[in-house]
From Swiss-Prot:
This is Aminomethyltransferase. HAMAP family: GcvT (MF_00259). It comes from Staphylococcus carnosus (strain TM300). It comes from the Bacteria. The glycine cleavage system catalyzes the degradation of glycine. The glycine cleavage system is composed of four proteins: P, T, L and H.
Length: 364
């Protein structure tokens, strides 16, 4: 593994834990601590903790901040209220997804964008290059932040017992500023990437080790790596940029149409393409797949009709720890979509039966 990889402040903790470290988006990150299945099940059944300090943070502030983010982001940022976050995307002129991200409204003139680690520099440069006609300051503040995710059925009660605010009524994408945990100031967000209840904790990068150590005083909290994070998000039908989303895929094609604006008067990047797809539909759409026969669908495998004609491609796939079955997200021709339809996945030299299912495959 290259010595040039970036490391989060928790890297030494990973080494001490004998975690398996891999390269991810230019970072040295733990793929697993014990086993992917154990960590996955801990999050589904009890709770787990992830270091996500590799994620990027871009701060936008100034008199025109609200107008600027409405211009550059796919979702309707006028719907943002204080202490509310929003899932959204940066789109290019063709509606393609440069990145998917979370926007936090800190106040009327200050917004924090949390972007994917591998895209941080690209996103920052792109955002900054479109800011010249707005009275805003765009700053890459990624080095200032640490981020932890505590996820699972017991996460709310546990985190709630440690902070100085009431979390019992927090709903998805609610957040609270100036929260204290272990004497440290944090932003507490009711969000995650697992399909479970839980929180994401944003803190000063100098505080993340102390908060990690403090949280792990509870033996029921299990450290989890990128492997479990991937199987959890795939079961939940949550896309990963670079696989399920890309600059050639629009929100309507990528299964995140809810993150595209309604038809508003204001100008925004990608408006014409997104407007046309909203009114007339896109040529392709993202689906969930469940394998009916033995086999694990992987990124790039062709999806075929029962006559062997190609109708799409797998964008992400794995074996579900919950069911033992192969599951996937795939993008197919819209005309070929029918819920429950049987299809084939070309797995090496075999054509293996699967069926179209909901993207979220968590059995609750």
């Amino acid at each position: 593994m290259s010595n040039d990889l970036k490391k989060t402040p928790l890297y030494d903790r990973f080494v001490e834990s004998n975690a398996k470290i891999v390269e991810f988006g230019g970072w040295a990150m733990p793929v697993q601590f014990s086993s992917i299945k154990e960590e996955h099940n801990a999050v589904r059944e009890v709770m787990g903790i992830f270091d996500v300090s590799h994620m990027g943070e871009v701060l936008i502030e100034g008199k025109d901040a609200s107008d600027f983010i409405q211009y550059i982001l796919s979702n309707d940022t006028d719907q943002l209220t204080d202490n509310k976050a929003q899932y959204t995307a940066l789109c290019n002129d063709k509606g393609g997804i440069i990145d998917d991200l979370i926007t936090y409204k800190l106040d009327n003139q200050k917004y924090l964008l949390v972007v994917n680690a591998a895209n941080t520099e690209k996103d920052y440069n792109w955002i900054n290059s479109h800011s010249e006609n707005f009275d805003v300051k765009v700053e890459n503040v990624s080095d200032q932040y640490g981020q932890l995710a505590v996820q699972g059925p017991e996460a709310r009660d546990y985190v709630g017992s440690l902070v100085d605010v009431d979390v019992s009524e927090m709903k998805p994408f609610d957040f609270k500023k100036d929260v204290t945990i272990f004497g440290k100031n944090i932003i507490l967000s009711q969000s995650g990437y697992t399909g479970e209840d839980g929180f994401e904790i944003y803190c000063n990068s100098d505080d993340v080790v102390d908060i990690w150590d403090g949280l792990l005083e509870n033996e029921n909290l299990v450290p989890a790596g990128l492997g479990a994070r991937d199987t959890l998000r795939l079961e939940a039908g949550l896309p990963l940029h670079g696989q399920d989303l890309s600059e050639d895929i629009t929100p309507y094609e990528g299964g995140i149409a809810f993150a595209a604006k309604p038809l508003i008067e204001a100008d925004f990047i990608g408006k014409e393409v997104l407007k046309e797809q909203k009114e007339n539909g896109s040529a392709e759409r993202t689906i969930g797949l469940e394998m009916l026969d033995k086999g694990i669908p992987r990124t790039g495998y062709d999806v075929l009709d029962l006559d062997g004609n190609k109708i799409g491609v797998v964008t992400s796939g794995t074996q579900s720890p919950a069911t033992g079955k192969g599951i996937a997200l795939a993008i197919i021709n819209r005309d070929e979509f029918e819920m429950g339809r049987e299809v084939l996945v070309q797995i090496r030299k075999r054509q293996v039966k699967a069926k179209i299912v909901k993207k979220n495959q968590i059995s609750k």
